[in-house]
Structures are given as C-alpha cells and as structure tokens.
C-alpha cells in the first residue's frame, strides 16, 4: 500500500493486477486500485476533481482529469473516510501512477491533496516444474 498525507487528509492506494482482464499477448495489461481517503483534519471537506498522471514502461505519459471520483464528489466530515475502486489499462507490463485531488474546505477555498505515486507491476510468474 502507498500513502500520503496533505493537510491532515490521508490518501492510501492499494493497486492489484487484474490477470483475467489482461491479455499480455495483445500488449494489454490491466490493474485495479483501491483508494481510501481519511479526513483526519478538523474541517469538513469535499472532493471536487481528480488529476492522474500515468506513465508506462516506455515513458509514455497519459494525463486524466475529471470531476469527482467514480461519478461522485464525496463530502467528508472530520473522522470520515471514503473508499472507491477503479482501474487502469496499459500496453506495457509495468507503469507508475501519481496524482492529486482538488478539495474544497468549509470556507469554500479550494486546495490540492496528494495521491501518492504507486507502481503497477505484473506479479512474477510462478514457475511450473514438470
């Protein structure tokens, strides 16, 4: 798991390889990731938007921006947490994701919180001995 804390808000990411959705012979590798956001600050905040930078093993960079996460803009009171899952396809067997969320505080001011960088790697293949 990967974790970052900004202004008392903790973002934890747990990536996992989706072997059944991947087709390595077609250069299609798919990962899922579970994100948990915990508001350990003293104010209510709302997640407004997201930004991801996805880099594959060849150095190709894809940027993704959008409103909220999985169609929602959750409000987190102090002590609340929010969890969601999403996915990412790549044409290489490894890559890196990093990003940030745009948040809004009680006073309406917006600020960014860090999504920690995390690696997407195909688990080592098990060797079968005959």
Swiss-Prot record:
InterPro entries: ApaG_domain (IPR007474), ApaG_sf (IPR036767), Uncharacterised_ApaG (IPR023065). Disulfide bonds: none annotated. It comes from the Bacteria. PROSITE patterns: APAG. Residues 3-127 form the ApaG domain. GO terms for biological process: error-free translesion synthesis. This is Protein ApaG. It comes from Brucella abortus (strain 2308).
């Amino acid at each position: 798991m990967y974790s970052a804390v900004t202004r008392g808000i903790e973002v934890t990411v747990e990536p996992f390889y989706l072997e059944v959705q991947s087709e390595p012979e077609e250069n299609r590798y798919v990962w899922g990731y579970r994100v948990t956001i915990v508001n350990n600050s003293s104010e209510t905040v709302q997640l407004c938007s997201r930004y991801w930078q996805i880099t594959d093993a060849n150095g190709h960079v894809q940027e993704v921006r959008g409103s909220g996460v999985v169609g929602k803009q959750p409000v987190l009171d102090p002590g609340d947490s929010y969890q969601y899952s999403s996915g990412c396809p790549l044409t290489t067997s490894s890559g890196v994701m990093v990003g940030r969320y745009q948040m809004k505080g009680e006073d309406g001011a917006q600020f960014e919180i860090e999504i920690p960088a995390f690696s997407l790697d195909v688990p080592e293949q098990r060797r079968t001995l005959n």
